[in-house]
Amino acid sequence: MYFRQIFEPKLAQYAYIIGCQKTGEAVVIDPMRDIQQYYDIAEKEKLKITAAADTHIHADYISGLREFAERGVKVYASDEGDADWKYEWLIGSDYDYELMKDGFTFMVGNIEIKAIHTPGHTPEHLIFAVTDKGGGADKPMGVATGDFIFVGDVGRPDLLESAAKMKDVMKPSAQTLYKSIEKFKSMPEYMQIWPGHGAGSACGKALGAVPKSTVGYELQFNNSLKHATSEDEFVNFILEGQPEPPLYFAQMKRDNKMGPKVLGGLPIPGKTETAKLGDFQGNREVALIDTRGREAFMNGHLKGAIFSPLDKQFNTTAGSYITEEQPIYLVIDEQDLEDAVRDLVNVGLDKIKGYIPVAEYEKWLADNNAAVAIPHLDFEKAGDKLLSGDVYVLDVRKASEFSEGHIDGARNIPHTRLLDRIDEVDPEGKTVYVHCSAGGRSAVAAALVQRFGHDVAYVDGEFDNWFNKEEEVAG
């Protein structure tokens, strides 16, 4: 049996290629949208991808299942859950597909894949137990757990309500998840766990960075599973302190259910003339993404630009600050373009119209005296203002962080929800001072606040260190 885990660091997502080396066939489990990467691996290993399967309708990225279906690969999707949780683009189509209920099995060469229904994260969620029958095994080696069991955590049951805006489903989903965990506890302790996400994903609150585990280890040391001693205890624990989901999650659920647009490959855009920048100035109908570093952006950028640097949060920021209808232009150098495009289409942002190289962008700003800046202060310099009431304090940390300590009078809007709640920012003529815990989230949020016409200052540095000192002085 061939096994390969493929990690996408910006979304902390794991996909899997599992192949039968005797027959040369392979399946891809939970593929992302850019499926060429899986073909490249399969070709190198002398395997042919004959199947692809999703554990569930994903909320955090566009699935590659339809891309595989377009290429004639047989795809497997859940048929659990009610009518709201069906793959509408697939059912009744001309694609080669099978719909799976609990206990459904299919073969990839001599490898058996068995679907097990584990609702809770979503109603239709399946996990896949993998048995290497060609190697003589009659019991599963491991299980691809999707967003059900992670290393150190379990899949959050609140997303249907907090992201997809369904009403009164959070607690029932948590209760259902508890029942699925009871089923999980009966699995052999030796079985390997191959999760759908790792540390950095918003699909849980305490995911580990170790890529694999075992059933036995997780039953002993997974904190969420340790709280599954009773339904009430588990429900209370799992619903407390979940991070606010990025704004694009609701769109991903819809697109993966109804059918994402078929790409057929990455849509690499051409270069845009700098003369177009004049049309983009202050134009919120267009999304100009400035991917430069923080200092360069704060010192000077086009009015209305969205700040989304090329770091691990690029997908999250872009997906939370840009709508799918907006045409996108990138301030970026050509060598970084392909990766940025891949990141954007992974979260359903397909309307990428062009790019402007950094040097040409900066020259145009200087030649046209068009650069605007955002004042940049640390907590020591901004402290008196933050405490004075003379400025509007916007705290873009998570609600759980805010509850542990915050500036009196501060407005808390987590940065991934800021676009949806931007009308709540009402400074009444005051400058908006934006802060988070260490400066990363507040930097991108300050740019968004400025994009909507407010005077803004960006506060950098370690909030907790400064805040604790202020409390000591006050005490």
Question: Where are the language model's segments positioned?
Answer:
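Histidine-centered catalytic micro-motifs
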Residues: A52-I62, H117-H125, I193-S201, V434-A438
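Short, well-ordered beta-to-alpha junction loops that form the rim of enzyme active sites
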Residues: P195-G200, K205-A206, A250-M252, T291-G293, ...
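Active-site metal-binding loops of divalent metal-dependent hydrolases
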Residues: P31-M32, I57, E80-G81, H121-T122, ...
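Active-site HxH/HxHxD metal-binding segment of metal-dependent hydrolases
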Residues: A12, T23-A26, R33-H117, T131-G134, ...
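Rhodanese-like catalytic fold shared by cysteine-dependent sulfurtransferases
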Residues: E88-L90, R156-D158, K167-M170, Y217-Q251, ...
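Metallo-beta-lactamase
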Residues: E112, T122-E244
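Active-site flanking residues adjacent to catalytic metal/cofactor-binding acidic residues
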Residues: I29, T55, G146, G152, ...
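Core dinuclear metal-dependent hydrolase active-site scaffold
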Residues: F3-Q5, Y16-I17, T105-D138, G142-V143, ...
